[in-house]
């Protein structure tokens, strides 16, 4: 029996031509960086260099930074990705040329209504949404919202105290994941949930389902390898995000808005109410107001931006304090002096606590939750002699920048003093980017920092954390998604009341 099919010459020619065209499609962009003299790992047809991410984005970036120096080229499938680490070029991309050339982030496939979200929207639509949301995140508004955040620190302490009697190590992700979810649902949707003790609550279930994301998901991979499929999926109403989850949040926001309009609950201060209020502002151009769909999109993106980031950052902070007891003691001393007898934290007090600020900054240097920043180049441009073609994704490897010994002596060491007032002038602002920089930086930066700080203060007023036999030292990082521990981060939590009585 013949192993080779008995095709006609025309069929063989058609097959050969199809294979050649398919190969050219899968590789035609892969010569861009070679032509520009930019080094980088060798790409494979269709896949590009994505196999380099098998150990995690951050590990790939660290290794490339060591091997190739200030810049290198990658290919996510066929998409050229230019990594830059020069602070002057970073400043140009994030700040100077943000509005003209580097306005947009990369869009990863079909996202449904979330294309209206501030993190994903583009060009003039992004500018309009950013302008409408910016007043929501001012210091004044956050100060008004602070009591909502602060009430959940009491729940946080209660949940931590419940676990003390069991004699088991405490999972930081469980504790801070619940705290983060409680704050997000309260500030974004006006819903109060003790999520640790109410895991069956529909908000908890839907949020957890929403956050289950894998870069090797078949749909995500298909649009990475074949970007032309994105508009097809859009037309078919197929999204990377579960339809039932988006439908749940859409219905919830509509119902809450209707109830609040009936009750005329203008005095309520949370993100949802502030967005509803913005629809009623008297503006010269009525189309500038947020639509109901845009309000849903912002509420959902707040979950994405706030849940995993806050819970992971707090987990990393407690881990670092546990393995550096001298730093923990110094921070507790500052807290006790500023807030004697476990007095409740106030917004203004938190802003005045210098060592707390140093600890948070150093935590975010070692573990920047968004390990990369990205901007899409809208037109051919030359920056400081570097030519960047239109359509290139310019990537800033934050994790690698924060570990660069040229800017951070002994970068693996946890030293909050790097961020003291005495040393602040020596820090290049474009080498420390936990929240990005420029007009498209993280709009929720102040909210995230105050959220972290009030939780740390409340926990350290009541407890001391210590490593235990189950604590993984050094910490291994997950290869998936945002920066987070690969395994559960377990610590021993000791009540400070016990510590004092023992002394």
From Swiss-Prot:
GO terms for cellular component: endoplasmic reticulum membrane. Its EC number is 1.14.14.1. Heme binds at residue 442. It is a peripheral membrane protein. It holds the Pfam family p450. It comes from the Eukaryota. Can activate aflatoxin B1 to a genotoxic product. Belongs to the cytochrome P450 family. This is Cytochrome P450 3A13.
